């Protein structure tokens, strides 16, 4: 399988993941634990690689990231500017 990149990054949402994580005051490890509780088996290193654009974020992971970070998937994808918590 070929992985396509944009400006050397495998995902576009990593910067937003980091922004939301820091806004919530979470460490990468704490975010990994929240994701594990939602059924996504990732560790701190995977979160780091997502944030730096070195890891692909499959479509099934995006809603779980959004839920863990209390944001929308559209915000993670850059389609919304407001990072307000979702209701």
Regions found by a protein language model. Give the residues of each.
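DNA major-groove recognition helix of helix-turn-helix
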Residues: 35, 51, 61, 80
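DNA-binding alpha-helical recognition surfaces that contact promoter or target DNA
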Residues: 15, 19, 33, 49, ...
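Short, charged recognition helix plus adjacent turn
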Residues: 1-8, 67, 74-87
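DNA major-groove recognition helix of helix-turn-helix/homeodomain DNA-binding modules
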Residues: 54, 58-75
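A short, Lys/Arg-rich alpha-helix, primarily the initiator
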Residues: 1-24
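Alpha-helical residues within the helix-turn-helix
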Residues: 22, 33, 67
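Short alpha-helical DNA-recognition segment
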Residues: 25-50
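Helix-turn-helix DNA-binding elements, focusing on the entry/boundary residues of the two helices
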Residues: 17, 28, 44, 59-62
């Amino acid at each position: 399988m070929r992985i396509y990149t944009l400006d050397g990054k495998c995902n576009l949402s990593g910067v937003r993941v980091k922004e939301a994580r820091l806004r919530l005051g979470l460490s990468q490890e704490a975010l990994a634990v929240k994701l594990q509780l939602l059924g996504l088996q990732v560790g701190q290193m995977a979160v780091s690689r997502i944030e730096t654009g070195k890891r692909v974020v499959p479509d099934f992971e995006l809603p779980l990231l959004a839920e863990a970070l209390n944001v929308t998937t559209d915000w993670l994808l850059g389609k919304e500017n407001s990072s307000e918590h979702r209701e």
